Amino acid sequence: MFQLLAGVRMNSTGRPRAKIILLYALLIAFNIGAWLCALAAFRDHPVLLGTALLAYGLGLRHAVDADHLAAIDNVTRKLMQDGRRPITAGLWFSLGHSSVVVLASVLIAVMATTLQERLDAFHEVGSVIGTLASALFLFAIAAINLVILRSAYRAFRRVRRGGIYVEEDFDLLFGNRGFLARIFRPLFRFITRSWHMYPLGMLFALGFDTATEVALLGISTMEASRGVPIWSILVFPALFTAGMALIDTIDSILMCGAYAWAYAKPVRKLYYNMTITFVSAIVALIVGGIETLGLLADKFMLKGVFWNAVGALNENFCQLGFVIIGIFTVCWVVSIVVYRLRRYDDSEVRA
């Protein structure tokens, strides 16, 4: 953990470190504040405190959904290649994602009875929009990663043989060469700041596909029908947002640390990207494929062992998210071990 955070604060000004400390302080304060509101609202209703704990747990769980992590980790690496420190990428993504859920919760609380039929109709359209936006984005990420992987592998081989390190070869995606680079450059040109993840998070949330989001909406509907005041019901989405923002922010900070270590030296940068870029492409393809197949199975009512397995994977994105965290962590650790055992740092690089 400390090595990762050290990687984020590479410059001597101390600003990244101060920003991380401030970010954690704000998130902790937000989490504490949300719980204080819950205690104040439900102090005479211990059952509702249990429901509040459930909403918070839903946020913590939803933060590690596979589509969240794949989008955050890949965009973090892209912004790191642009020379930025996107430690708030995960925060902005989660805020965009949760804002849709919060808005829906408010609408449901206001119109608990009349909105239910409309919610079903919106789910039909929203699920298609949200899933397609998520899957297409991840497929584009996978294609871009494969372009970067090809460029990094060629540059690494040349440098190891005593050749000259050419930065433009590594950054093929952002140069003027390459067919896929020209196709997908507009997509990544849009995301040039951490806050650009906010609208992307909103797109990912439109479908209300996951059990966590549906459960939170169900909680809002249930409590509204019981006569719980609107401001008290808002505690549930606030807790959901607090939990999700905390975990997604931690993820982007950890990824910044891993990528910062890799970019300290040209050879290290090339070697690391050959390993982590390959994993990123595979993860993006798998997650995007699962989402697309799940959408096809749902809309065309496809049955069978294969489609049942696809449905199970879509219903358990949380578990898949933990697998992704493990894959990225193991890949990063193994790349460091192999890199040091082979003494790649001792390679002379001619720029």
From Swiss-Prot:
The chain crosses the membrane at residues 20-40, 52-72, 95-115, 129-149, 200-220, 244-264, 270-290, 317-337. It comes from the Bacteria. It is found in: Cell inner membrane. InterPro entries: Ni/Co_transpt, Ni/Co_transpt_high_affinity. GO terms for molecular function: nickel cation transmembrane transporter activity. GO terms for cellular component: plasma membrane. It is a multi-pass membrane protein. Belongs to the NiCoT transporter (TC 2.A.52) family. High-affinity nickel transporter responsible for nickel uptake. Necessary for high levels of activity of hydrogenase and urease. Does not transport cobalt. This is High-affinity nickel transport protein. The gene is hoxN.
